[in-house]
């Protein structure tokens, strides 16, 4: 006997949320996908609430311009599913897994639902292998763990997206594995730039891109990270791959959840965020993990509203991360990029039994000097450097050189800066900073350490500036 379609009718519309009347005995399950057909278009909704009397409330995954009350709504009987497997590589998708790159439609493919359970404790696997990024400040002070979760925190315009793109360039090209990029509520232009940069770098054939940009409704922005994660999970669990998952920007996931929560009639929690903030974040983050079959290493850009790191959105993300890289507007104002604040950043991998004793001691000494330099800032502002003790003068001079040497020219920014990008090996970074701490280069002008990769390049730059070893 042929299965009868479950059909309802729209009874109320408010923006991207609709109420649909179904027969009482055939209400669609929570998270089921609903479909509305208008002319040749199909709009997909996801069931969020059962209101009783056969009415369900659902969230749109695309624009709802042409909707009207009374339109028929079809229950698909399943969750939103996206294509997975080798066919998604080198392609660009929307939240529903539909290609948006103008390429040919996918041939036969497997589809997986975007909602899934996190791996159990028995399936998970702990690892302490360092992921080399080639970026000095990260490799030395905030080392990333393979299979870990990394957060890049910063306000507007401090360089989060550029840092994510540099990490994609450095890790994806050297790592050799597969990558999935989720563009969550960010600019369409950035997605376009990234697509062509990856194509140029030759890593597009190992990458899948999924976008729910800022012009799309909150339902799409809230679910696009799950669509990308579903693709990454398939590579981890069925292809036994080590996968890189880039999310830019995880704050927009929270922001979209807040918009939807208000439309669903929930009472807001702290600072206007949804009361389910911790639960939603946990459901996403707990799926991003390493298992006995493969690993997912996640790099997430996190916008910090009004530069307030204690805001509930970034604060909720903090608890899930292995490494926290904080970008600071004050450092960016000095013209030092990446504008990473070493004193606010941290990594659980910075332990002698993981990175080695020498690396650990050099990193701690660098942080100590920068901390002392920060403490002296008020005295310098009031009395000037001349009033400091000789030992403090030495700390200030050395800290300025260290601060400048933590800057680095990026490959993805060389068309703007005109400086060739640099990838620095961890051992070279540790040795260079060890020599800098020893006072060996105290006589080199501090400007020579800006935007160079190694000490040798700093010496070369100093000579071009008129410095000689006799000075």
Curated annotation (Swiss-Prot):
Produces ATP from ADP in the presence of a proton gradient across the membrane. The catalytic sites are hosted primarily by the beta subunits. InterPro entries: AAA+_ATPase, ATP-synt_VA_C, ATP_synth_F1_bsu, ATPase_a/bsu_AS, ATPase_alpha/beta_chains, ATPase_F1/V1/A1_a/bsu_N, ATPase_F1/V1/A1_a/bsu_N_sf, ATPase_F1/V1/A1_a/bsu_nucl-bd. The gene is atpD. This is ATP synthase subunit beta. It is found in: Cell membrane. Gene3D superfamilies: 2.40.10.170, Bovine Mitochondrial F1-atpase, Atp Synthase Beta Chain, Chain D, domain 3, P-loop containing nucleotide triphosphate hydrolases. Its main location: membrane. Its EC number is 7.1.2.2. It is an enzyme of class 7 (translocase). Keywords: ATP synthesis, ATP-binding, Cell membrane, CF(1), Hydrogen ion transport, Ion transport, Membrane, Nucleotide-binding, Translocase, Transport. GO terms for molecular function: ATP binding; ATP hydrolysis activity; proton-transporting ATP synthase activity, rotational mechanism. It holds the Pfam family ATP-synt_ab_N. ATP binds at residues 154-161. F-type ATPases have 2 components, CF(1) - the catalytic core - and CF(0) - the membrane proton channel. CF(1) has five subunits: alpha(3), beta(3), gamma(1), delta(1), epsilon(1). CF(0) has three main subunits: a(1), b(2) and c(9-12). The alpha and beta chains form an alternating ring which encloses part of the gamma chain. CF(1) is attached to CF(0) by a central stalk formed by the gamma and epsilon chains, while a peripheral stalk is formed by the delta and b chains. GO terms for cellular component: plasma membrane; proton-transporting ATP synthase complex. Transmembrane segments: none annotated. Belongs to the ATPase alpha/beta chains family. It is a peripheral membrane protein. It catalyses: ATP + H2O + 4 H(+)(in) = ADP + phosphate + 5 H(+)(out).
């Amino acid at each position: 006997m042929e299965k009868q379609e479950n059909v309802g009718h729209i009874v109320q519309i408010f923006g991207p949320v609709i109420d649909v009347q179904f027969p009482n005995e055939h209400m669609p399950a929570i998270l089921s996908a609903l479909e509305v057909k208008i002319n040749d278009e199909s709009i997909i909704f996801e069931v969020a609430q059962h209101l009783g009397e056969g009415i369900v409330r659902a969230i749109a995954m695309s624009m709802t311009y042409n909707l009207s009350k009374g339109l028929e709504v079809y229950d698909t009987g399943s969750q939103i599913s996206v294509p997975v497997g080798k066919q998604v590589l080198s392609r660009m998708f929307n939240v529903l897994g539909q290609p948006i790159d103008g390429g040919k439609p996918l041939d036969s493919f497997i589809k997986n639902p975007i909602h899934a359970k996190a791996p159990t404790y028995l399936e998970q696997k702990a690892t302490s292998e360092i992921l080399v990024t080639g970026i000095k400040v990260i490799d030395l002070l905030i080392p990333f763990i393979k299979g870990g979760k990394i957060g890049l925190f910063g306000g507007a315009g401090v360089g989060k997206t550029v840092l994510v793109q540099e990490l994609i360039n450095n890790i994806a090209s050297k790592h050799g594995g597969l990558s999935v990029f989720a563009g969550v509520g960010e600019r369409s232009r950035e997605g376009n730039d990234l697509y062509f940069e990856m194509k140029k770098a030759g890593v597009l054939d190992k990458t899948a891109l999924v976008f729910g940009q800022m012009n799309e409704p909150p339902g799409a922005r809230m679910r696009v990270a799950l669509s990308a994660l579903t693709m990454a999970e398939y590579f981890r669990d069925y292809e036994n791959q080590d996968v890189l998952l880039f999310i830019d920007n995880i704050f927009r996931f929270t922001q979209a959840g807040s918009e939807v929560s208000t439309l669903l009639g929930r009472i807001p929690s702290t600072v206007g965020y949804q009361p389910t903030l911790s639960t939603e974040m946990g459901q996403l983050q707990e799926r991003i993990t390493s298992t006995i079959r493969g690993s997912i290493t996640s790099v997430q850009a996190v916008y910090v509203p009004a530069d307030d790191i204690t805001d509930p959105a970034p604060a909720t993300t903090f608890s899930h991360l292995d490494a926290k890289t904080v970008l600071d507007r004050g450092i960016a104002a000095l013209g030092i990029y990446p504008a990473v604040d070493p004193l606010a950043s941290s990594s659980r991998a910075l332990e002698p039994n993981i990175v080695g004793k020498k690396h650990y001691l050099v990193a701690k000494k660098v942080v100590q000097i920068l901390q002392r330099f920060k403490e002296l800032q008020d005295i310098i502002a009031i009395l000037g450097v001349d009033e400091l003790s000789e030992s403090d003068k030495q700390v200030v001079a050395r800290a300025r050189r260290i601060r400048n040497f933590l800057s680095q020219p990026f490959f993805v920014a060389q068309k703007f800066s005109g400086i060739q990008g640099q990838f620095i090996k961890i051992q070279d970074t540790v040795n260079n900073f060890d020599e800098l701490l020893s006072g060996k280069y105290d006589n080199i002008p501090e400007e020579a350490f800006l935007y160079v990769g190694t000490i040798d390049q700093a010496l070369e730059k100093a000579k071009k500036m008129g410095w000689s070893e006799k000075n």
